[in-house]
C-alpha cells in the first residue's frame, strides 16, 4: 500500500510569508519520511510550485493539485496548510481544496473567513458568553475619524491593528490622542479594515487545542511575558518575550482557560490545531483576544511547547490530524 502524499503548504501573499516558511520547515522535520511522503508546496502570487529537493522546484498543476516528477504524475492526498494570512487563513485556499476534493487540516471556508476577521469572530463568540474587550471597527470610509469622538467613546490607552492578519504586524499601542491617526494609517496600510480595542490589563496567556478521535484536547496553558510594551512582532520572533509553559496561574484558572478553549473550538467547528489568546483580568475571568487557526509551528512556537509540556509527541499529534482527515474522506 503506497504512502499517502501530503502537501505542506506555505508562503502566501501577506507580510507573514517568512513566518509561514519557518512553520512549514518545522512541520516537515516532525513528519519526516514516514508514514507519509511530505512535500513543501510554495504558494506565491505568480507561481505555485513543489519543492522536490533542496535545489529543485517543479510547477504545481492547480487543476487537480498534482505535479510531475521523473515522468510520473503525482497527486496529493492531503494538504497541511501552514500559511499565516491570505490565502491560507481566510478561507480562499480551503474553498479551492474543497472544489477539487483534497482534505486539509483547518476549518472550512466559513470557519476560516470568520476567524480571520478578528472583530466579527470576537463578536460572534461573545454571543455565547465569551468575554471580549470593548472594540470598534473602521472601514476604508473611516480613514480620518474624529479623534476626540473616538477617544471619548473608547478611552485611552488603545490598541490599533489590522482587523485581518496576524503576527501583530502594524499593531500600535496608543497612549495619547496624537498617536491615534498615525496608528490608524499604519494599520490601514496592511488591510481594508482596522480594529480599535480597549487596553486590557492582566496576565496574557495562550492555549492550543486539537481534535483527536472526535474529542477536543486542550493543551497546557502558556504565560506570555513580553519585554516590549506588548507582544508585538519583535517579541514573537526576535526573542523579546518570556514564554512560560505551564503558565504560573492557579489550577482553577488553568482548567477555566482549557475549558473555554475547547468550547471555542467546538463553537467554531474548528479542525486541526488552533490557538486562543486571552488576558486574565484582576477578577480572574479571561478576556478573549483572538483565535488563530494556523498557529506558528516552529520548534520554539507556542504549540510545540505546549505539546511537550503535555508529554505528547509533536509527530504523533500531526499524524493523528492527518490520519483523521484522510479517514473522513474514505
UniProtKB/Swiss-Prot annotation:
Sites binding Mg(2+) 1 sit at: 277, 290
Question: What species was this sequence derived from?
Answer: Porphyromonas gingivalis (strain ATCC 33277 / DSM 20709 / CIP 103683 / JCM 12257 / NCTC 11834 / 2561)
Q: What does this protein do?
A: Cell wall formation.
Q: Where in the cell? A: Cytoplasm
Q: Where are the transmembrane segments?
A: none
Mainly resides where?
A: cytoplasm
Q: Which positions bind Mg(2+) 2?
A: 290, 292
Q: E.C. number, please?
A: 6.3.2.4
Matches recorded under SUPFAM superfamilies: Glutathione synthetase ATP-binding domain-like, PreATP-grasp domain
Question: What's any GO biological process attached to this entry?
Answer: cell wall organization
Q: Which GO terms describe its molecular function?
A: ATP binding; D-alanine-D-alanine ligase activity; metal ion binding
The protein's annotated pathway: Cell wall biogenesis; peptidoglycan biosynthesis
Q: Which gene encodes it?
A: ddl
Q: Please state what the protein is called.
A: D-alanine--D-alanine ligase
The record's annotation in PANTHER family points to: D-ALANINE--D-ALANINE LIGASE, D-ALANINE--D-ALANINE LIGASE B
Key word DNA-binding present: no
Q: Which cofactor does it need?
A: Mg(2+); Mn(2+)
Q: Which InterPro entries match?
A: ATP-grasp (IPR011761), ATP_grasp_subdomain_1 (IPR013815), D-Ala_lig_Van_CS (IPR000291), D_ala_D_ala (IPR005905), Dala_Dala_lig_C (IPR011095), Dala_Dala_lig_N (IPR011127), PreATP-grasp_dom_sf (IPR016185)
Say which family it is in. Answer: Belongs to the D-alanine--D-alanine ligase family.
Q: Specify the ATP-grasp domain's residue ranges.
A: 122-323
Amino acid at each position: 500500500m503506497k504512502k499517502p502524499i501530503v502537501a505542506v503548504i506555505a508562503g502566501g501573499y501577506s507580510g507573514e510569508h517568512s513566518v509561514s516558511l519557518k512553520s512549514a520547515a518545522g512541520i516537515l522535520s516532525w513528519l519526516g519520511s514516514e508514514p507519509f511522503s511530505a512535500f513543501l508546496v510554495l504558494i506565491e502570487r505568480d507561481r505555485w510550485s513543489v519543492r522536490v529537493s533542496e535545489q529543485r522546484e517543479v510547477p504545481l498543476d492547480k487543476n487537480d493539485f498534482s505535479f510531475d516528477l521523473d515522468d510520473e504524475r503525482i497527486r496529493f492526498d492531503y494538504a497541511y496548510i501552514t500559511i499565516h494570512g491570505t490565502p491560507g487563513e481566510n478561507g480562499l485556499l480551503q474553498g479551492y481544496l474543497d472544489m477539487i476534493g483534497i482534505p486539509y487540516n483547518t476549518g472550512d471556508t466559513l470557519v476560516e473567513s470568520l476567524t480571520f476577521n478578528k472583530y466579527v469572530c470576537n463578536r460572534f463568540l461573545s454571543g455565547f458568553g465569551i468575554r471580549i474587550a470593548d472594540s470598534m471597527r473602521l472601514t476604508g470610509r473611516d480613514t480620518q475619524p474624529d479623534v476626540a469622538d473616538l477617544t471619548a467613546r473608547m478611552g485611552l490607552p488603545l490598541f490599533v491593528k489590522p482587523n485581518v492578519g496576524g503576527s501583530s504586524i502594524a499593531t500600535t499601542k496608543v497612549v495619547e490622542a496624537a498617536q491615534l491617526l498615525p496608528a490608524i494609517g499604519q494599520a490601514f496600510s496592511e488591510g481594508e479594515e482596522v480594529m480599535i480595542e480597549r487596553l486590557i490589563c492582566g496576565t496574557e496567556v495562550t492555549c492550543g487545542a486539537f481534535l483527536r478521535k472526535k474529542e477536543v484536547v486542550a493543551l497546557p496553558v502558556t504565560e506570555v511575558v513580553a519585554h516590549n510594551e506588548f507582544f508585538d512582532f519583535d517579541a514573537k520572533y526576535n526573542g523579546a518575550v518570556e514564554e512560560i509553559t505551564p503558565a504560573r496561574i492557579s489550577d482553577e484558572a488553568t482548567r477555566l482557560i482549557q475549558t473555554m478553549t475547547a468550547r471555542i473550538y467546538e463553537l467554531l467547528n474548528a479542525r486541526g490545531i488552533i490557538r486562543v489568546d486571552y488576558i486574565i483580568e484582576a477578577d480572574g475571568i479571561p478576556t478573549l483576544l483572538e483565535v488563530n487557526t494556523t498557529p506558528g509551528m516552529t520548534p520554539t512556537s507556542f504549540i510545540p511547547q505546549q505539546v511537550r509540556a503535555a508529554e505528547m509527541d509533536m509527530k504523533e499529534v500531526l499524524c493523528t490530524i492527518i490520519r483523521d482527515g484522510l479517514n473522513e474522506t474514505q
